[in-house]
Swiss-Prot record:
UniProt name for this protein: 5'-nucleotidase SurE
HAMAP family: SurE
Keywords noted in UniProt: Cytoplasm, Hydrolase, Metal-binding, Nucleotide-binding
Location within or outside the cell: Cytoplasm
Chief place of localization: cytoplasm
Organism name: Cytophaga hutchinsonii (strain ATCC 33406 / DSM 1761 / CIP 103989 / NBRC 15051 / NCIMB 9469 / D465)
């Protein structure tokens, strides 16, 4: 029986510690192919490259692993992998990460990590985005390996509904072992931005975005609650942004003319 084919992507770039950890774990589960950005692409969301060149170069960073570095975005990496690198072979699983930093709650909309996974879901492929709530470039991923393997194995064995991707976040290293896995909803939280006005050495004005993450959702069924209480959070996500619950109300209440 042939090994599962697993495509690995990320947004922190091919040189990150997180992707190296993910490749290590996925190599225990199947045949791994890597297509990742050649430089950090954090916060790129679902951007794709249009009207500009895309470059793809083979990489020897991971001995025994077929790997490529791409000049484009995380979503570009998935598209190039499917249509060029894999040459018609269909991955059994696409995994993205492990991101250096949280992609819980509203961050999923800005996340290049999750956009790579969502792009795979758009292609009808099972996909998972993994993130660690630690922004340090040298973050310790050792405590999440077993959970990454467990979750990926579940998807490989049992599958996942088409159009759905899993957003998995891990607490940073803590003094006690992680308590387990919580399947939960996305918290209603947001980033409260502020912009620092600064001047470069030539006296030209520029702005630097700063701010803080604000979670005012007190629910104990959210990803933010799970992470704050020592659990791995798993949120099933859909790329269908339709507010289905409002379709009937708007058709009833809004006085549009219907043919």
């Amino acid at each position: 029986m042939s090994k599962p084919l697993i495509l690995v992507c990320n947004d922190d770039g091919i040189f990150s510690v997180g992707i190296r950890t993910l490749i290590e774990v996925m190599s225990e589960l199947g045949e791994v192919v890597v297509v990742a950005p050649d430089s950090p692409q954090s916060g790129m969301g679902h951007a794709i490259t249009i009207g500009n060149t895309l470059r793809l170069e083979a990489s020897d960073l991971f001995p025994g692993i077929v790997a490529y570095e791409c000049s484009g975005t995380p979503a570009d990496c998935v598209k190039l992998a499917k249509h060029h690198v894999l040459k018609g072979r269909k991955p059994d699983l696409v995994v993205s990460g492990i991101n250096h930093g949280s992609n819980s709650s509203i961050s999923v909309l800005y996340s290049g990590t999750m956009s790579a996974a969502i792009e795979a879901a758009l292609e009808g492929l099972p996909a998972i985005g993994f993130s660690l709530c630690d922004y340090n470039a040298h973050a310790d991923f050792s405590h999440v390996k077993a959970f990454v393997k467990q979750i990926a194995s579940e998807v490989l064995t049992n599958g996942i509904a088409k159009g759905i991707t899993l957003n998995v976040n891990f607490p940073a290293v803590i003094n006690a072992p992680l308590k387990g896995i919580k399947i939960c909803r996305q918290a209603h939280a947001r980033w409260e931005e502020k912009f620092d006005e600064r001047f470069d050495p030539y006296g030209r004005r520029y702005f630097w975005m700063a701010g803080s993450f604000e979670n005012k959702d007190a629910g104990e069924d959210t990803d933010e609650w799970a992470l704050a209480n020592g659990y791995v959070s798993v949120v099933p996500c859909s790329y269908d942004l339709t507010a289905h619950q409002l379709l009937g109300q708007l058709n009833r209440d809004w006085k549009f003319i219907h043919e």
